[in-house]
């Protein structure tokens, strides 16, 4: 090698002694090394002084793993050593030197540095180390191997413990771990795991039971005989426990491998929870003593087997990857012994949960891109984040666990095979981990005792449910039954019900029985077959304050004529008398009904104009002369006759005039004359405009709006023809339809095949269909309208399946 060197960063307070001093000896294949404090190896700096005469006696005598090639030791600032001078056999090395970074195949032959040499850089072209090496207080020799021999290394550590492994084969041997270094654990720890030798027999197992315990400050001894597992001797000259009864922080590393056969439900793993009571069955703080138990946290990482760079991993190879579980915590002597006893009991007890393998192949695919280290294995850096200081655990009280929410899922982070963190969802009952919420929900079906527990319970009865909305709906049924006076009563039969649903079912019975019953409004001529529609009509039309009040009964009326007619009930006045009998009535409509029902057979002859009946034909003819004399003004466009010219003019303008020049600015309604528009505008003043919630129709009169909704936007047709069963929304429409069955005059359209007995309907047909002056036409039937609102109403009534454009 041309130049090999190390950078020394701190003042030297430890040394290598190659003179065979006491405490360091070579016993066959066994090397005994005393280690006290941790040192680190750093980078190379420029050179000023070179130390020569370092010739290796036997290149294969000592091998230090994980070395760095082409490193030069330079710039040794030693006032007592001259350049190119021979030195003795003793070398003083500063604190932060780690032999894992010493140049490969370099040994120390003869090198002595005086005691007063401070932090320096020593360079050498060739160095050798004898078999007996003594280390000072601040040097850790991590991994020393003898090539070609099966050896055993025993490290006696006073202040910290570092695991060491003996390499039984040359460097080309498949190695899982060569060096584990834990540094600066006050806030976080970084573990560089390069692998641990794995026997071929252990590869066939589903998981590994080997584990490593790394103590950062505790004294201990790790022994390895090359054939059996590693052991750790915790005997030390220094008491590891502190004065306050606490012990240094402990990191426990559990290594296990994945099983290719466990791929259902996305792969599961049973890992002990991070709380101390779940890990060891010991409370956080013993109330009978001041001993503090370990404060532990769970971290997961993986260590991949050595794989060629050009070889892709398949499902079976991913399943064989090694996973690590790391527990970090503080420990004292008594608690450590108790934890060790519990751990041994768990290892012997078959019912205790063990580490189950994870089949990451089925869950995350064949992603084999990982970080490669110098030996070719995937190197995973483990970051441990501590939430609390090391000295504040005794002052903290154990936190109470929050009640888990069924809609929230706990997660755990596992470093996957590719070195990236993976989120898993643990089962709160058995501890298994799953890659998604869906697999966790499917797994929860295996716990029927958990599913049987309902989250929400009714306080009034034994009803339970898992859904909040179901409980809310159930509580609604108790609102009306809590008090007897709040029971719902049927307005037709007086029967009481506990909730609205039962009342609605009961009303359906009344609806079927009284399908033909008509409900008439007390204030107007409105009639309907459903009581609900009548109630809505009363609220929409007659809910205002009526100014004309009866002084006898307090009933209100909208017009004085209605009040005058009502007062005849209290006074007994009956001004209308039947001309055929002594019947008298307070209402003219009742008199007409009486004549039709009682005297229709006695007077079979009826006037076609006013529908009056007579006993013989002479009376009818005399009566017809009255109509002819009174209506001498004949309309030129139709058969309409008027008694005076003004009525005839009004008829022609309203029926036979197509233009509406006078339009309202508020509702866009058109009128023939300005006087009509003036009356219409006066109706808008001081009145609130009511907007139809189904279309753009607006009106100040709520009664008209209600009639509009019932006629245009209501599907119910309560009035049906007894002959053809055709339905109508209003009784007036039914009366017009009945004329088609009476053999009356039929109006035939000259432009199409349309015919009707209703003269007004025939005129509307001619104007809307066969007139070109209507700008708004229906897109489906080409019918014309004067205003857009009329077209929208037509579409809603006759083209419901299409809807508004």
Swiss-Prot record:
The entry's keywords: Activator, Disease variant, DNA-binding, Intellectual disability, Metal-binding, Nucleus, Phosphoprotein, Repeat, Transcription, Transcription regulation, Zinc, Zinc-finger
Cross-referenced PROSITE patterns: ZINC_FINGER_C2H2_1 (PS00028), ZINC_FINGER_C2H2_2 (PS50157)
Ranges annotated as spanning the membrane: none
Signal peptide range: none
One CC-aspect GO term: nucleoplasm
Subcellular location: Nucleus
Phosphoserine PTM sites in chain numbering: 274
Cited Gene3D superfamilies: Classic Zinc Finger
Zinc finger (C2H2-type): 425-447, 456-478, 488-510, 519-542, 548-570, 576-599, 605-627, 633-656, 662-684, 690-713, 719-741, 747-770, 776-798
Pfam family membership, one: zf-H2C2_5
GO molecular function terms noted in the UniProt entry: chromatin insulator sequence binding; DNA-binding transcription activator activity, RNA polymerase II-specific; RNA polymerase II cis-regulatory region sequence-specific DNA binding; zinc ion binding
The keyword Cell cycle belongs to this UniProt entry's keyword annotation: no
Disease: Intellectual developmental disorder, X-linked, syndromic 37: A syndromic neurodevelopmental disorder characterized by developmental delay, intellectual disability, behavioral abnormalities, hypotonia, congenital anomalies, and facial dysmorphism.
Membership in a protein family: Belongs to the krueppel C2H2-type zinc-finger protein family. ZFX/ZFY subfamily.
Its biological purpose: Probable transcriptional activator.
This protein's name: Zinc finger X-chromosomal protein
Species name: Homo sapiens (Human)
């Amino acid at each position: 090698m041309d130049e090999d060197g190390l950078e020394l960063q701190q003042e030297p307070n430890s040394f290598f002694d190659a003179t065979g001093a006491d405490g360091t000896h070579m016993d066959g294949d066994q090397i005994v090394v005393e280690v006290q404090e941790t040192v680190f190896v750093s980078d190379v700096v420029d050179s000023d002084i070179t130390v020569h005469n370092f010739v290796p006696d036997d290149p294969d005598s000592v091998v230090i793993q994980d070395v760095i090639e082409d490193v030069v030791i330079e710039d040794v600032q030693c006032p007592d050593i001259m350049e190119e001078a021979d030195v003795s056999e003793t070398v003083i090395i500063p604190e932060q030197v780690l032999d894992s970074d010493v140049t490969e195949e370099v040994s120390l032959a003869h090198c002595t540095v005086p005691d007063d040499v401070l932090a320096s850089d020593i360079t050498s072209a060739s160095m050798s180390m004898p078999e007996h090496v003594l280390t000072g207080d601040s040097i850790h020799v991590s991994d020393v191997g003898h090539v070609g021999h099966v050896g055993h290394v025993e490290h006696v550590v006073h202040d910290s413990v570092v695991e060491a492994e003996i390499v039984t084969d040359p460097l080309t041997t498949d190695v899982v771990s060569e060096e584990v270094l834990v540094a600066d654990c006050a806030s976080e720890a970084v573990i560089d795991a390069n692998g641990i030798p794995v026997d071929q027999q252990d590869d066939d197992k589903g998981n590994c039971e080997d584990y490593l315990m790394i103590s950062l400050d505790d004294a201990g001894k790790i022994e390895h005989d090359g054939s059996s597992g590693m052991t750790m001797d915790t005997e030390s000259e220094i008491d590891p426990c502190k004065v306050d009864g606490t012990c240094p922080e402990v990191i426990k590393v559990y290594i296990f491998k994945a099983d290719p056969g466990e791929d259902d439900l996305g792969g599961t793993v049973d890992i002990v929870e991070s709380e101390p009571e779940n890990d060891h069955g010991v409370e956080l703080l013993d109330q009978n003593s001041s001993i503090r138990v370990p404060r532990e946290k769970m971290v997961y990482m993986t260590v991949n087997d050595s794989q060629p760079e050009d070889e892709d991993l398949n499902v079976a190879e991913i399943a064989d990857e090694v996973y690590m579980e790391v527990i970090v915590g503080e420990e004292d002597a008594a608690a450590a012994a108790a934890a060790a006893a519990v751990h041994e009991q768990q290892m012997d007890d078959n019912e205790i949960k063990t580490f189950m393998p994870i089949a990451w192949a089925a869950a995350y695919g064949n992603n084999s891109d990982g970080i490669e280290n110098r030996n070719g294995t995937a190197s995973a850096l483990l970051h441990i984040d501590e939430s609390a200081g090391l000295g504040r655990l005794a002052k903290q009280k154990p936190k109470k666990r929050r009640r888990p929410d069924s809609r929230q899922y706990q997660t755990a982070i596992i470093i996957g095979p590719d070195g990236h963190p993976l989120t898993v969802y643990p089962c709160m009952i058995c501890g298994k981990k799953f890659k998604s919420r869906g697999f966790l929900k499917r797994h929860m079906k295996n716990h029927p005792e958990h599913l049987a527990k309902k989250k929400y319970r009714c306080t009034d009865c034994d009803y339970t449910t898992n859904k909040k909305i179901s409980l809310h709906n159930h509580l609604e049924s108790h609102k009306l039954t809590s008090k007897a006076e709040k029971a719902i009563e049927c307005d037709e039969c007086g029967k009481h019900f506990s909730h609205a649903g039962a009342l609605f079912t009961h009303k359906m019975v009344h609806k079927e029985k009284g399908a033909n019953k008509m409900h008439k409004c007390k204030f107007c001529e409105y009639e309907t077959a459903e009581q609900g529609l009548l109630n809505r009509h009363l609220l929409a039309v007659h809910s205002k304050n009526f100014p004309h009040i009866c002084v006898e009964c307090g009933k209100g009326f909208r017009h004085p004529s209605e009040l005058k007619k009502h007062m005849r009930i209290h006074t007994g006045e009956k001004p209308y008398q039947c001309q055929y009998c002594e019947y008298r009535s307070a209402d003219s409509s009742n008199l007409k009904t009486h004549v039709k029902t009682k005297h229709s057979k006695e007077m079979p002859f009826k006037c076609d104009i006013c529908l009056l009946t007579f006993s013989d034909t002479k009376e009818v003819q005399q009566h017809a002369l009255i109509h002819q004399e009174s209506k001498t003004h004949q309309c030129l466009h139709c058969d309409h006759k008027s008694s005076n010219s003004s009525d005839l003019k009004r008829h022609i303008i309203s029926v036979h005039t197509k233009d509406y020049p006078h339009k309202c600015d508020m509702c866009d309604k058109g009128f023939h004359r300005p006087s009509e528009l003036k009356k219409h505008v006066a109706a808008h003043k001081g009145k609130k405009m009511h907007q139809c919630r189904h279309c753009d129709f607006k009106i100040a009169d709520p009664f008209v709006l209600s009639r509009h909704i019932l006629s245009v936007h209501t599907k119910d047709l309560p009035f049906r023809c007894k002959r053809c069963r055709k339905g109508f929304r209003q009784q007036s429409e039914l009366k017009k339809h009945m004329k088609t069955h009476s053999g009356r005059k039929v109006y035939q359209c000259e432009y199409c095949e349309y015919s009707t007995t209703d003269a007004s309907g025939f005129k509307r047909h001619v104007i809307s269909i066969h007139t070109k002056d209507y700008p708004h036409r229906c897109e489906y039937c080409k019918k014309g309208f004067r205003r857009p609102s009329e077209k929208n109403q037509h579409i809603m009534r006759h083209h419901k399946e299409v809807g508004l454009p």
